[in-house]
């Protein structure tokens, strides 16, 4: 039997006239939608990343106040295990869910049934209406993204019944705290308390609330739907931008190859601000697995925090609160060139690394080839350079679509000249970070001046009255060493235990111990050699004080012999420097408050016939000694960290060409070849000398080395 045709729609106002007179026309139809997952319900819906198991919906025609048929559909979940809360509230079982349809088929049925009901009611385009935002933003969109399903356009806009209710009844509690039951209670509606079908009572009550709200509507109700962004939009961020602290989160644990689009997909359903994904880089310019994400409002940020420990592939991602200042620090920039480069919308950014320094736009475009053209040709390339204009070997390229970017990525590790080029996906924030890092790095970083040295000579000698412990556990303490030596610990000199640190300031596994005599040092070595300490055997060998001091100052002592510290290696010029008259050093007041007076220069220098040379502890970036003295220090061990003076035996071999007054000389190692005098002087800007204190030039023995005289500084290049 053929069903009768649907009745014609009731006469209504002319749409053209209505749209002209009513700036906010009501929608033709509303689809009240309720859903549940196999896990948490209520405000925590979707926070546990469980699959959707139930959809209940009913159509409401606002103009005629008619309602359609109520529909309920189960959804087959991949993980059929139900939480106790869901099992108790729904009464469902794993067997009933196993016989249900998959999500894609349920969505097809939903579209067909809703279209039929809307046609029967004489409505037009319809909009979804839900109780809160969790169902669409936290459940449907993320699950569809995980399963690679394409949602209909109708799922990208909806009305939040709680927000519409709060708009008409602002005296109630906040929209976030409302529920279907509290809304019906505030309106004085009678609900069917006997309805025990899970989801049906909620939809019927929501329909009753909507019809009651429509009766007292002033034309503003159901006029501004919530929008779910379909695509993440890239864009630049300026250092001058003000970012609300309540809109930023930090995601940690991202795969190193993930892009901003991957991060946006992880937060699918939430509205990320334009250019709101900033991947963080480490000190080497590589991604560290973290990202800062900026959302359009605080409500989106709160929903993002509920995705803590959700999965991206096989990895779970941690989500924490962050600040707007952190986001601007990572994503913000000040370069107009970068702003113009990033001003093109809907572009895919790739980073090229390892370019030859002589490569130009023509070379890069030829490397990529005609099959993957760069947007704008040479204008779509951005080369990263040092502050002095030298190329770094990095560049960024823009591509119009994902297909062209994929074609360019196939050139990964392709050859350009004699070098292979690496290609990676990039983001606008990464462009800003890389450019900011190179633009802000000076030729010579200005470091805080180290403490001025206090001499504490080590007693030199060739007698092997010390022992060296090699192969110590890195966690070994002074107590472990004393326990390891046993009875020999009683023969240690006061303050005679010295731990050796590596270039990073961590224990190196070596230690030196000063014994009372050569005989006791030999006895300790014979008794303790290759004894076990914490599952490791330790070598104990005798050595002299001179050998110990050289190792502590940066040299090495191995089976092949003694290697001197770096400062004692052969150099182009003699290791002696003439000195000049010097006034008291100008030390800032804030610096003097940090250190004891004994660590600062005296008020006036005392003339001396000769000044011992200084040993340098290692590279110029090392501001600490590479040893630590324990077990209380004797007169022969340092009590503060600083530079060591040379042993007395080293003074006999040094020339005696010295001036009558000792000067404050500083030796700088690792200076860039392009550094000029201004770069050198900027390092010592707080330690100038008076102009009357240098009247002569320092004699040098190497013609290429020259002395430059400045109004307030001495510079020896």
From Swiss-Prot:
Keywords of this entry: mRNA processing, mRNA splicing, Nucleus, Phosphoprotein, Repeat, RNA-binding
InterPro entries hit by this protein: ESRP, Nucleotide-bd_a/b_plait_sf, RBD_domain_sf, RNaseH-like_sf, RNaseH_sf, RRM_dom
Organs and tissues of expression: Epithelial cell-specific.
Compartment(s) where it occurs, according to its Swiss-Prot or TrEMBL record: Nucleus
Region (Disordered): 1-23
Source species, domain of life: Eukaryota
Entry's Gene Ontology cellular component terms: nucleoplasm; nucleus
GO molecular function, one term: mRNA binding
GO biological process, one term: alternative mRNA splicing, via spliceosome
SUPFAM superfamilies in the cross-refs: Ribonuclease H-like, RNA-binding domain, RBD
Stretches assigned to the RRM domain: 247-343, 348-428, 465-545
List of residues that carry Phosphoserine: 83, 563
Pro residues bias spans: 1-14
Subunit description: Interacts with RBPMS.
PANTHER family hit by this protein: HETEROGENEOUS NUCLEAR RIBONUCLEOPROTEIN-RELATED (PTHR13976)
Similarity section: Belongs to the ESRP family.
Functional summary from the UniProt entry: mRNA splicing factor that regulates the formation of epithelial cell-specific isoforms. Specifically regulates the expression of FGFR2-IIIb, an epithelial cell-specific isoform of FGFR2. Also regulates the splicing of CD44, CTNND1, ENAH, 3 transcripts that undergo changes in splicing during the epithelial-to-mesenchymal transition (EMT). Acts by directly binding specific sequences in mRNAs. Binds the GU-rich sequence motifs in the ISE/ISS-3, a cis-element regulatory region present in the mRNA of FGFR2.
Name listed for the protein in its UniProt record: Epithelial splicing regulatory protein 2
Gene it is expressed from: Esrp2
